[in-house]
Design a protein with these regions (language model features):
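Non-cytosolic membrane-interface motifs at loop->transmembrane helix junctions
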Residues: 119-132
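N-terminal signal-anchor transmembrane alpha helix
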Residues: 5-36
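Juxtamembrane "helix-exit" motif on the non-cytosolic side of transmembrane helices
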Residues: 110-120
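Interfacial helix-start motif at the membrane-water boundary
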Residues: 49-72
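Interhelical loop segments of eukaryotic multi-pass membrane proteins
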Residues: 30-50, 154-162
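Non-transmembrane, juxtamembrane loop and terminal tail segments
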Residues: 156-178
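Hydrophobic alpha-helical cores of multi-pass transmembrane domains in eukaryotic membrane proteins
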Residues: 12-24, 72-76, 97-109, 131-145
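Juxtamembrane helix-break-helix junctions at the cytosolic face
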Residues: 78-93
Length: 178
């Protein structure tokens, strides 16, 4: 069964918005401050103060290791994933499963830390921060589940390369027959 179009668009928007968030916010756990634009440092400071985020404030080593993986592997996937989900390409299935399972798995210790951190001043602040991070568990987990459940998540048309399929629709290439 092909992927629901609403979910496909949720994934495209999720991945597209994750690009600036990763570059401007998350990368600050590893990139020296002198290389980070002032507006991005201010944005992170605002987030830490408004949401009482001890992970971005104190940046423990285990958290930095997850950010390193995000920068090296997930950031490129965001671009590739946006393209593939937007253009309905079935070849994204395996990379999407890997991305979804890895990302969902990394959110377990992050959410556990938020739930048990002594650095968050109140239950309301803890809940607020928990719900800020929760979509980064739920959406990747849903991506993995949906892609695991479908050999061809975008149906048969998801197998054709974009340029060849477009040329074929316009009559420039012959249609293959069995």
């Amino acid at each position: 069964m092909p992927m629901n179009d609403t979910f496909r668009w949720i994934v495209v928007v999720f991945l597209a918005t994750h690009i600036p968030a990763t570059i401007m916010m998350d990368s600050q756990a590893l990139v020296p401050a002198k290389f980070v634009p002032k507006f991005a440092r201010s944005l992170l400071e605002f987030h830490v103060n408004a949401n009482h985020d001890p992970l971005m404030e104190f940046q423990p080593v285990w958290f930095k290791s997850l950010i390193a993986f995000e920068l090296v592997f997930q950031l490129p996937f965001f671009f590739v994933g946006c393209y593939a989900f937007y253009h309905k390409r079935n070849w994204i299935r395996l990379p999407g499963i890997v991305y979804g399972t890895h990302t969902a798995t990394t959110l377990i210790p992050i959410l556990a830390d938020i739930l048990h951190s002594g650095d968050i001043p109140s239950a309301a602040a803890r809940a607020q921060l928990f719900f800020i991070y929760l979509p980064y568990l739920v959406i990747p987990a849903m991506i993995a589940v949906v892609l695991c459940a479908n050999d061809q998540p975008f149906g048969a048309q998801g197998n054709a390369p974009a340029k060849r399929a477009k040329a074929r629709r316009r009559g420039f290439l012959p249609v293959k027959t069995a």
